[in-house]
UniProtKB/Swiss-Prot annotation:
Biased composition (Low complexity): 1-21
Residue sites binding phytochromobilin per the record: C322
Family the UniProt entry places it in: Belongs to the phytochrome family.
Superkingdom of the organism of origin: Eukaryota
PAS domain: residues covered: 618-688, 748-822
Name of the protein in question: Phytochrome A type 3
UniProt xrefs under InterPro entries: GAF, GAF-like_dom_sf, HATPase_C_sf, His_kinase_dom, HisK_dim/P_dom, PAS, PAS-like_dom_sf, PAS_2
Residues of the GAF domain: 217-402
UniProt keyword annotation of Iron present: no
Description of how the protein assembles with itself and partners: Homodimer.
Key words, A-Z: Chromophore, Photoreceptor protein, Receptor, Repeat, Sensory transduction, Transcription, Transcription regulation
Region (Disordered): 1-24
Pfam families: GAF, HATPase_c, HisKA, PAS, PAS_2, PHY
Length: 1129
């Protein structure tokens, strides 16, 4: 597939290409199925797949065959033998269709069950309630009355004639209700509760294991879930099967019993799992085949039904003969498959708005959890449901891994783009990003790259020859003349005539045109080179019977499909290439735009003024909020010393503000909370802000006897103007009363109603459910919060009717939120300790409520769990306001960071123009004095580049920052002249005379060190001296140079520079900022002096400031090494 660079967004491009791919693939599936049905024993799977790849494009005339194929898939009239099926009229509950084995299974008389009545007969028109005992019939009738009839699955019923128990599994189909009946085995303990809550206990251990994973590795996640499913179900083989972007599949993770051939690493063509089957997996997320050799059972329908009964939602639906043959060939007699459904586009996560699930983004099938067994195997419905829930939890974590991978990917690409941009700005030539390190191959994954520039070719690793590069460029100019870029996973399919000559090593290509003649290329080899084989049979050329559909034959077919193809280029890779293309065009554009330089100062000035005004307003608001908030707020500096303690914190703890300030935070919390606070403080100082952390604070004075104060805290890193973390602010919520209520509730069973229904505003919103999942409690605070009265929600299913991702009283944001709530509720019912979790739902009026939720088990006197109680905590208006202000502060910091990035990018373009102008001047007839001025300009240019590079430093003002020193030989005269030149215009404006009382020996001294940094330091202190000198004053520079021998031919030079100026001197506040004695916000001058002082300390030097009558002096010291030229003298 090849594509030019479109203007639409990557998500829309992705969606359109996906739809087109699915339509084309469905047609191919239909063709294969038709060939199979017609060919019989002569069916050759491998040849057909290869023929489809090389065949003509899909024609519209085949649509009838596709429709027939889809109808055949969806409307089969056969079921498997592990149960029986009834289809019921929705209004009367009379039978309108039944499987041939249903009468025998449901109405056979058992001699062990005495009966005086005639046994019921099962046929068309039979009322389903007549077949079962009263209790089972009532439960079934109740379930059939729900809008979501599957909500109570499985329903335990007993046959009236035989007394045999069955699981009734209900779902709605077009025009009717379909009920599967699966017998409960004598060895199986039946699930006595309606609904799915009991199934959770079966998967509780596996879910806890997945929940405890740290994240950051998709491979670890998949290996864990595969191992847990293997242990839970007992199948011989369990695999995590992942679909790739082009719909082909891969066994990503696998575990088997000893002796089985592994399939790990096998890739399968997209036709192995047809699109119609994938659609069914999206609707019915668990599929079980008990015995592929068993005879299927027919379904008998009433005559003249106005619709076809669809068995798509039935677990009993029989597999198609093609799939049965595949299973037989691979000796997989039984299988169990769970769908893993994730968000369709992880790139759009940040665009998700607070809307109910039905308005949310679509889902896609990420892959399957596949279980195989070498003998017939039946898994009861409760265990299947547990596996389905486990797959849902797994899908939530897959989504999280997508997000982590996306963040890491963006970070790495951004880092690489920055490094390549820096190289371009320094050299102003694309050759530097090809010949240097890193280079363009580090930007995206590829096997080779090339640059065509000025008619010449530069090649990297596995790239075509120079003549082939020219040939590709000619083809691009001829066929894709109007395109600024191109990406293809197959040059052969894209129509490049020379693709065959390139062979398998050059299949895919991405192109970025700098201009009509200069082009960047990236190349990829064929896909098979990327494929790994997981077992001993690692030679794909081993002979197989091409007529027997088998995993290794599918792998061979896949290799045929991907011949002459590479891995596809993803949207984020093309975005990275496109960004580099824009940078290259801007850097190499000879026609500069004068308006850019003129508008730059205005834009920077506006940003600066707006940013400072906004920051001052935010800071003032933060201070006011902290002092007046009705929630406790405390703050510490980088050493953990308290520098903020509001009145609410003082009121709760009994510790006055004056007594708290200056004390270490760890001395104020309970011993049991010290590790928690230490971790929270450490992470916050690293910029990682934890949320909803609970710890206990000591009480003092009159509050001492009340016990510790329990706080739930959000950590907010305090940052300075340059986004450096300088402390931590803790925005807390007092949970002491909440904890007392919970403790009292769990201890005193008889008092719970008085507590729950107390209208006291201190009582939080509380709701509960019994052990079967029915809502059993809903207090007054919950009614006020949600808008739903107690009698409107009691005796409804808590998970499904009260809370659900759609069609519930309180809709949740999406399916992931529902799964998380299920885990929390079921964990409490299983007796596990649960932590508070973020929770959100839409109230009756459609307003989205964000809160914390804690679930606690309810026990009877005997210690048996009889239900669950949930406590909701909603943040106060003050806390919400404080969080909004914090967000505004973070946005302001982000604005300033973007401004810095913009400045850095925009400044480099005019700097490149200045560099070009100076180089051009050097080639003209200049006298010695003019050449000196050009040399001064070059030195100032190097200084600017050095300062711009410092913007990458995370902590530029800290002594331990990564500011580097480059050792090179330089003349002290060059440093002084360049530094003085930077203040001459200011001196002329104020009438200040600047004099350099420097001896000739000093000026001609050649030394080793970082001359650019020394120049930066000297210019900073000169600027400050000039700024705070009176009009008409003077500034004097003097020096002292001492050599210390440390060997026969090596000397260390102790350099001392004095900058003396007239006037009152530099303000004390500025000096305090330079010497880090002032923790307040730093000014621009203070920051500049602090950075210069840190640089001096890296040079084993420092700065002192002397203030005398009418005169002030900076004394600068540094340690350098003498250069060889000086040693020779």
């Amino acid at each position: 597939m090849s594509s030019s660079r479109p203007a639409s967004s990557s998500s829309s491009r992705n969606r359109q290409s996906s739809q087109a791919r699915v339509l084309a693939q469905t047609t191919l599936d239909a063709e294969l199925n038709a060939e199979y049905e017609e060919s019989g024993d002569s069916f050759d799977y491998s040849k057909l797949v290869e023929a489809q790849r090389d065949g003509p494009p899909v024609q519209q005339g085949r649509s009838e065959k596709v429709i027939a194929y889809l109808q055949h898939i969806q409307k089969g009239k056969l079921i498997q033998t592990f149960g029986c099926l009834l289809a019921l009229d929705e209004k009367s509950f009379n039978v309108i269709a039944f499987s041939e084995n249903a009468p025998e299974m449901l109405t056979t008389v058992s001699h062990a069950v005495p009966s005086v009545d005639d046994p019921p007969r099962l046929g068309i028109g039979t009322n389903v309630r007549s077949l079962f005992s009263d209790q089972g019939a009532t439960a079934l009738h109740k379930a059939l009355g729900f809008a979501d009839v599957s909500l109570l699955n499985p329903i335990l019923v007993q046959c009236k004639t035989s007394g045999k128990p069955f699981y009734a599994i209900v779902h709605r189909a077009t025009g009717c209700l379909v009920v599967d009946f699966e017998p409960v085995k004598p060895t199986e303990f039946p699930a006595t509760a309606a609904g799915a809550l009991q199934s959770y206990k079966l998967a509780a251990k596996a879910i806890s294991k997945i929940q405890s994973l740290p994240g950051g590795s998709m491979e670890v996640l998949c290996n864990t879930v595969v191992k847990e499913v293997f242990d839970l179900t007992g199948y011989d083989r369990v695999m995590a099967y992942k679909f790739h972007e082009d719909d082909h599949g891969e066994v990503f993770s696998e575990i088997t019993k000893p002796g089985l051939e592994p399939y790990l690493g096998l890739h399968y063509p997209a036709t192995d799992i047809p699109q119609a089957a994938r659609l069914l997996f999206m609707k019915n997320k668990v599929r079980m085949i008990c015995d592929c050799r068993a005879r299927s059972i027919k379904v008998i329908e009433a005559e003249a039904l106005p619709f076809d009964i669809s068995l798509c939602g039935s677990a009993l639906r029989a597999p198609h003969s093609c799939h049965l043959q595949y299973m037989e060939n691979m000796n997989s007699i039984a299988s169990l498959v769970m769908a893993v459904v994730v968000n369709e586009n992880e790139e759009d996560d940040e665009a998700e708005s607070e809307q109910p699930a039905q308005q949310q983004k679509k889902k896609k099938l990420w892959g399957l959890l596949v279980c195989h067994h070498e003998s017939p195997r039946y898994v009861p419905f409760p265990l299947r449901y547990a596996c389905e829930f486990l797959a849902q939890v797994f899908a939530v974590h897959v989504n999280r891994e997508f997000e982590l991978e996306k963040q890491l990917r963006e970070k790495n690409i951004l880092k690489m783009q920055t490094m390549l941009s820096d190289m371009l700005f320094r050299e102003a030539s694309p050759l530097t990003i090809v010949s240097g390190t890193p280079n363009i191959m580090d930007l995206v994954k590829c096997d080779g790259a090339a640059l065509l520039y000025g008619g010449k070719v530069w090649r990297l690793r596995n790239a075509p020859t120079e003549s082939q590069i020219h040939d590709i460029a000619f083809w691009l100019s001829d066929v894709h003349r109007d395109s600024t870029g191109l990406s293809t996973d197959s040059l052969h399919d894209a129509g490049y005539p020379g693709a065959a000559a390139l062979g398998d090593m050059i299949c895919g290509m991405a192109v970025a045109k700098i201009n009509s003649k200069d082009i960047l290329f990236w190349f990829r080899s064929h896909t098979a080179a990327e494929i790994r084989w997981g077992g001993a049979k690692n030679d794909p050329s081993d002979m197989d019977d091409s007529r027997r559909m088998h995993p290794r034959l599918s792998f061979k077919a896949f290799l045929e499909v991907v011949k002459m193809k590479s891995l596809p280029w993803s949207d984020y890779e093309m975005d990275a290439i496109h960004s580099l293309q824009l940078i290259l065009r801007g850097t190499l554009n000879d026609a500069s735009k004068p308006k850019r330089e003129a508008s730059l100062d205005n834009q920077i000035g506006d940003l600066k003024l707006d940013g400072l005004a906004e920051l001052q307003a935010v800071t003032s608001e933060m201070v006011r909020l902290m002092e007046t908030a009705t929630v406790p707020i405390l703050a510490v500096d980088g050493n953990g010393l308290v520098n903020g303690w509001n009145q609410k914190a003082a009121e709760l703890t009994g510790l006055r503000v004056d007594d708290a300030i200056g004390r270490h935070i760890l001395t104020l919390v309970e011993d049991s909370s010290v590790p928690v606070v230490q971790r929270m403080l450490y992470l916050a100082l690293q910029g990682k802000e934890e949320k909803e952390v609970r710890f206990e604070v000591k009480t003092h004075g009159p509050k001492r006897d009340d016990g510790p104060v329990i706080l739930v805290v959000n950590a907010c890193a305090s940052r300075d103007l340059h986004d450096h973390v300088v402390g931590v602010c803790f925005v807390a919520q007092d949970m002491t009363v909440h904890k007392l209520v919970m403790d009292k509730f769990t201890r005193v069973e008889g008092d719970y109603k008085a507590i729950i229904h107390n209208p006291n505003p201190l009582i939080p919103p509380i709701f509960g459910a019994d052990e079967f999942g029915w809502c059993s409690e809903w207090n007054a605070a919950m009614t006020k919060l949600t808008g739903w009265n107690r009698d409107e929600v009691l005796d409804k299913m808590l998970l499904g009717e009260v809370f659900d991702s759609s069609n519930a009283s309180c809709p949740l944001k999406n399916r992931d939120a529902f799964v998380s709530l299920c885990v929390l509720i079921n964990s409490a019912l299983a007796g596990e300790e649960t932590e508070k979790a973020p929770f959100g739902f839409f109230d009756r009026s459609g307003k989205y409520i964000e809160c914390l939720l804690s679930a606690n088990r309810k026990e009877n006197e005997g210690g048996l769990i009889t239900g669950v109680f949930c406590f909701i905590h909603v943040a106060s208006h003050e806390l919400q306001h404080a969080l909004q202000v914090q967000q505004a502060s973070e946005q302001t910091s982000l604005k300033r960071l973007k401004a810095f990035s913009y400045m850095r990018h925009a400044i480099n373009n005019p700097l490149s123009g200045m560099l070009y102008s100076r180089k051009a001047l050097k080639n003209t007839d200049l006298n010695e004095e003019q050449m000196k001025q050009i040399h001064v300009g070059d030195n100032c240019h190097h200084q600017i580049n050095k300062i711009l590079a410092d913007l990458d430093q995370d902590s530029i003002t800290e002594k331990s920052s990564c500011l580097d020193l480059e050792m090179a030989e330089f003349l002290l005269q060059d440093v002084v002249v360049a530094a003085v030149s930077q203040v001459l215009i200011t001196c002329q404006g104020k009438g200040i005379r600047i004099s350099c009382n420097l001896p000739e020996r000093f000026m001609k001294q050649s030394v080793y060190g970082d001359g650019v940094r020394l120049q930066q330091i000297l210019s900073d202190f000169l600027f400050i001296s000039v700024k705070f000198s009176p009009v008409g004053g003077s500034v004097e520079i003097s020096s002292k140079l001492t050599k210390n021998s440390i060997g026969e031919n090596l000397h260390l030079i102790d350099l001392e520079l004095r900058i003396k100026h007239q006037g009152l001197g530099v303000p004390a506040e500025l000096m305090a900022q330079m010497f880090e004695e002032d923790n307040k916000e730093q000014s621009e001058e203070g920051l500049s002096l602090l950075v210069s002082r840190n640089l001096l300390r890296l040079m084993n030097g420092d700065v002192r400031h002397l203030r005398e009558a009418g005169v002030s002096t900076f004394i600068i010291t540094a340690e350098l090494a003498s250069a060889p030229t000086a040693m020779g003298q």
